[in-house]
Amino acid sequence: MRICFFCNLIEFKPKGNVLQFFIMLRALDRKLEQLNSRERKRYAFDCVLPFSFRNGTGGFHFSHVRFHQSDDPTQTILSLDRKNKYDFIFVRGRNDAHKLLQHKESLSQKLLYLATQYNLQDPYIMGRTDYLFRNSRMVFFQTEPNAERYRRYQLNKGSYSEQELTRKIQVLPQFVEPSRHPLKMRREDKPLHLIMAGVIRPRYGLAVAAKAIQLIRKHSPKARLRVLYPSIVGTYRKRAQQLLRMPGVSDHGQKSMWETKEMIVDSGIGLALLYDRTSDQNPSHSYLSRILEYMALGVPVLTTRTVGNLALLGEDYPLFVEYAFDIQEKYMRLCDPQYYEEMSQYVKERGKRFLAEHAVEPLWDALHREYRLGTKK
């Protein structure tokens, strides 16, 4: 099986889309490592990137994936395909997949498209999404709710049978990379802190979190809101910087994936708010990578009730919040060690499937199932 992977990343940065892509590749690399040398020869995995990736960057070491830097990724993929005759070409991103097919439409027989988002209210976006769906072997969505929503959309259009949609629509969630070393557990005698990790956007509720820590500190004066982020959305920068300077808020800036894991465990309570005011509610159908990280580490997460979070945590999850005083109330409950342990075990059990070693299995199976179908044609 020969696969070329492409993601239009400008640089390596410890943020969601970058980490998702590299964690997936690393998980596939580990799958190849588990094979004996004879079996491994049946596979060839290449990856084209706009920047030069140095093996080991960010803690990502590869033994069986070959990286190619290119200023013109589309032409490089076409050239590599002529040379290697790939079985699949995996592309993350709507515009890049579309551009590839515009250069060579016959690649639709090989295209695996990772759809990161779509908007049912936008005719242009849906036109491109539907074109890619028609002209690909499989389309991967990052969450069950988004995959199901698109499946219903196609069923209503009547262009595909349920059987065909079941084969062609797959779910490829973000993976959580396992820790390299056992993490030092938080001592019970230490105060619980809130931690927010990830890109800062207006919809992620930093103002609500900052207000919540003021309320919490009236009863627990040593508690902090720790904020880790690779970037701040430009239009929100001034307001975000004001909030990051508020009493009780600790601005930690950008941390590596490994440092972030350590700080999450040391803090004790994950915070992941989402106030989605988009017309299509696409963010609400997503899984925030920070929530998956908290869950996999067994750190209780306070989060808003969205379609995606209901799929992750269950209808009856007791730590859904909306307002600052909700966060304060849940924080006080989690100060009970027995309750904290119950919630820790609950999220850890539900987060297990996103650990890379488990999450890669459905992808591995889907690739081989589709590969076998191709060899029969």
Residue ranges and their predicted role:
Residues 3-7, 140, 180, 184-204, ...:
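Conserved donor-binding/catalytic core segment of Leloir-type glycosyltransferases
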Residues 91-96, 115:
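Short His-centered aromatic/hydrophobic patch
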Residues 123, 134-167, 176-178, 311, ...:
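A short, active-site helix/loop in glycosyltransferases that binds the activated sugar's phosphate group
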Residues 49-51, 224-238:
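Glycosyltransferase donor-sugar binding loop
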Residues 288, 315-325, 332-338:
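Conserved acidic donor-binding segment of nucleotide-sugar-dependent glycosyltransferases
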Residues 14-15, 204, 258-263, 270-293, ...:
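Nucleotide-sugar-dependent
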Residues 229, 237-269:
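Nucleotide-activated donor-binding/catalytic signature segment of Leloir-type glycosyltransferases, i.e.
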